[in-house]
């Protein structure tokens, strides 16, 4: 996981920002799919 994404994730979890967490999860999912396939 890239550093910027980790930071965003931690921030979202600290603020209990569910919308942001969902968004970042999708972002990470697509990122992984793109780089792994």
Swiss-Prot record:
GO biological process: sporulation resulting in formation of a cellular spore
Localization per record: Forespore
Alphabetically ordered keywords of this record: Sporulation
InterPro entries: CmpA
GO cellular component: intracellular immature spore
Subunit structure: Can form a complex with SpoIVA and ClpX.
Protein name (database record): Cortex morphogenetic protein A
Gene name as annotated: cmpA
């Amino acid at each position: 996981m890239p550093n910027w994404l980790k930071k965003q994730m931690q921030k979202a979890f600290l603020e209990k920002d569910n919308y942001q967490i969902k968004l970042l999860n999708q972002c990470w999912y697509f990122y992984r799919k793109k780089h792994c396939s």
